Amino acid sequence: MVNKIKTSTHEPKSKRLTLRPVSGKEGLFYGIKSDGKRYTVRSDRLRYFFPDEWLKFLECIKPSRVILFETLLQTGGRIEEVLNLKPGDFTWDNNSVKLRVTKSKAKKGESRVLGGKQRNFGVSSQYCRRLRKYIREGNIKDDEFLFKISKQAVSQMLKRGVKASGLKEWEFSLHNIRKTSGMWLKTVQRRGFDLDVSEICMRQGHDYETFLKHYGSPSIFTDRDRDKIVDILGDMYKLR
């Protein structure tokens, strides 16, 4: 099987990028760039963690790094947003967080803030207790980054954890955790919790049309799954 994708609407129809399936990895394709470098493309980017998968995945992560992945799930933030978080971005009195650096671009080892609308929303008290313990034990100051690690290192950690938990590592990227966060909130909202779709869109930094386009149907989760999702998310929005 060979998939062909046009590189540009302005190029001749005969000039196409050819994607070929990666042996033994269903749904993963590879191509060769003009500079000879190989790259991979997933046919389905809408892969969400099921709650049991998420819990098993966390068991395969180094204990000191679990809080990083919990932060990705609790905030639904992009990896760049989460890696720019500092203790001072949290308000412990009401268990809320402000994502200040919402868009950034790295070039030649330098990170440049591009702007974007800041987002301020609540997270669970259970998560906040674990995060505050992490901050105390690491003696992290209010103006220091919570997670002193590169995006590439986190990505590799994710891949290793996913593979160790028995899942297909090529089906997951860091962005899939963000997708999971939004999908889980959509799932509990469908279940009857007083959680407006506009609130979910605000958390994710999406408009309504983008949210509808990029998130699937909550019907993929069973009632048991939804109960576990509520348990994992904690008392965010008084879900429990």
What positions do the PLM features span?
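DNA breakage-rejoining catalytic core of tyrosine-based enzymes
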Residues: K25-W54, K108-S125, I140-K141
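Catalytic-site neighborhood detector that most strongly recognizes the C-terminal catalytic loop/helix
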Residues: K105, Q204-I229
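C-terminal secondary-structure termini that scaffold catalytic or DNA-interacting sites
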Residues: M1-D35, T40-V41, R224, K228-R240
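Short, polar N-cap/turn motifs at the start of nucleic acid-interacting alpha helices
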Residues: F90-W92, R191-G216
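Basic, Lys/Arg- and aromatic-enriched nucleic-acid-binding interface segment
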Residues: F49-I79, Q189
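Conserved tyrosine-mediated DNA breakage-rejoining catalytic core shared by Y-recombinases
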Residues: N84-R130
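Major-groove DNA-contacting interfaces characterized by cationic-aromatic clusters
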Residues: R38, S125-M157, K163
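Short, basic (Lys/Arg/His-rich) helix/loop patches that form interaction surfaces
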Residues: I140-E144, Q156-M202
